[in-house]
Amino acid sequence: MTEWETATPAVAETPDIKLFGKWSTDDVQINDISLQDYIAVKEKYAKYLPHSAGRYAANGFRKAQCPIVERLTNSMMMHGRNNGKKLMTVRIVKHAFEIIHLLTGENPLQVLVNAIINSGPREDSTRIGRAGTVRRQAVDVSPLRRVNQAIWLLCTGAREAAFRNIKTIAECLADELINARKGSSNSYAIKKKDELERVAKSNR
């Protein structure tokens, strides 16, 4: 037998994909069992950059498979003047994650996941009625909408905090995520969530 036949095949190891080359997804825990299918953060969804150019709006529920950091990045591209500037928002998120790591010493992905879990309202009120009589009725919120609303509230809070402020939007996003992770009332998202749940409770 020649040495070619006896040689053991080299096993190509898959490289460990880290977000921005720094943050690993392996140790990220999703403590809320109802949101585990809707927060895409596991190895399967790992990306070097939060930009996959996927067609997530093609089907309902497809966006649940969009990596959660990419959903945050896309949500930061709001208000006309920032529409389509994804490179700018990727840079903002990267900077915010570095600030979070400096302030907390934790994996920023874990901080983001915890902030989303804490910021999603569990109960909301909807309008029910016909022929002129409208009343509000408390309803449970689906897991996907909880994630959608949490991301929207976190981004809105960061955007409003940075407006006419000396702090950069990356610093405001980092503060918002850290406060939401703690459940602090300094967070815009937590305040809004509590308000929505309070209104829903009064409409039960």
From Swiss-Prot:
<comment type="function">
    <text>Component of the small ribosomal subunit. The ribosome is a large ribonucleoprotein complex responsible for the synthesis of proteins in the cell. Part of the small subunit (SSU) processome, first precursor of the small eukaryotic ribosomal subunit. During the assembly of the SSU processome in the nucleolus, many ribosome biogenesis factors, an RNA chaperone and ribosomal proteins associate with the nascent pre-rRNA and work in concert to generate RNA folding, modifications, rearrangements and cleavage as well as targeted degradation of pre-ribosomal RNA by the RNA exosome.</text>
</comment>
<feature type="modified residue" description="N-acetylmethionine">
    <location>
        <position position="1"/>
    </location>
</feature>
<dbReference type="GO" id="GO:0003729">
    <property type="term" value="F:mRNA binding"/>
</dbReference>
<feature type="cross-link" description="Glycyl lysine isopeptide (Lys-Gly) (interchain with G-Cter in SUMO2); alternate">
    <location>
        <position position="47"/>
    </location>
</feature>
<dbReference type="GO" id="GO:0006412">
    <property type="term" value="P:translation"/>
</dbReference>
<dbReference type="InterPro" id="IPR023798">
    <property type="entry name" value="Ribosomal_uS7_dom"/>
</dbReference>
<keyword id="KW-1017">Isopeptide bond</keyword>
<feature type="modified residue" description="Phosphoserine">
    <location>
        <position position="142"/>
    </location>
</feature>
<dbReference type="GO" id="GO:0042274">
    <property type="term" value="P:ribosomal small subunit biogenesis"/>
</dbReference>
<dbReference type="Pfam" id="PF00177">
    <property type="entry name" value="Ribosomal_S7"/>
</dbReference>
<dbReference type="GO" id="GO:0022626">
    <property type="term" value="C:cytosolic ribosome"/>
</dbReference>
<keyword id="KW-0539">Nucleus</keyword>
<keyword id="KW-0963">Cytoplasm</keyword>
<dbReference type="GO" id="GO:0045202">
    <property type="term" value="C:synapse"/>
</dbReference>
<dbReference type="GO" id="GO:0022627">
    <property type="term" value="C:cytosolic small ribosomal subunit"/>
</dbReference>
<dbReference type="GO" id="GO:0003735">
    <property type="term" value="F:structural constituent of ribosome"/>
</dbReference>
<dbReference type="InterPro" id="IPR000235">
    <property type="entry name" value="Ribosomal_uS7"/>
</dbReference>
<feature type="modified residue" description="N-acetylthreonine; in 40S ribosomal protein S5, N-terminally processed">
    <location>
        <position position="2"/>
    </location>
</feature>
<keyword id="KW-0007">Acetylation</keyword>
<protein>
    <recommendedName>
        <fullName>Small ribosomal subunit protein uS7</fullName>
    </recommendedName>
</protein>
<feature type="modified residue" description="Phosphothreonine">
    <location>
        <position position="14"/>
    </location>
</feature>
<dbReference type="GO" id="GO:0000028">
    <property type="term" value="P:ribosomal small subunit assembly"/>
</dbReference>
<dbReference type="GO" id="GO:0005730">
    <property type="term" value="C:nucleolus"/>
</dbReference>
<comment type="subunit">
    <text>Component of the small ribosomal subunit. Part of the small subunit (SSU) processome, composed of more than 70 proteins and the RNA chaperone small nucleolar RNA (snoRNA) U3.</text>
</comment>
<keyword id="KW-0687">Ribonucleoprotein</keyword>
<dbReference type="InterPro" id="IPR036823">
    <property type="entry name" value="Ribosomal_uS7_dom_sf"/>
</dbReference>
<dbReference type="InterPro" id="IPR005716">
    <property type="entry name" value="Ribosomal_uS7_euk/arc"/>
</dbReference>
<dbReference type="InterPro" id="IPR020606">
    <property type="entry name" value="Ribosomal_uS7_CS"/>
</dbReference>
<keyword id="KW-0597">Phosphoprotein</keyword>
<keyword id="KW-0832">Ubl conjugation</keyword>
<feature type="modified residue" description="N6-acetyllysine; alternate">
    <location>
        <position position="47"/>
    </location>
</feature>
<dbReference type="GO" id="GO:0006450">
    <property type="term" value="P:regulation of translational fidelity"/>
</dbReference>
<dbReference type="GO" id="GO:1990904">
    <property type="term" value="C:ribonucleoprotein complex"/>
</dbReference>
<keyword id="KW-0689">Ribosomal protein</keyword>
<dbReference type="GO" id="GO:0005840">
    <property type="term" value="C:ribosome"/>
</dbReference>
<comment type="similarity">
    <text>Belongs to the universal ribosomal protein uS7 family.</text>
</comment>
<dbReference type="GO" id="GO:0019843">
    <property type="term" value="F:rRNA binding"/>
</dbReference>
<dbReference type="GO" id="GO:0032040">
    <property type="term" value="C:small-subunit processome"/>
</dbReference>
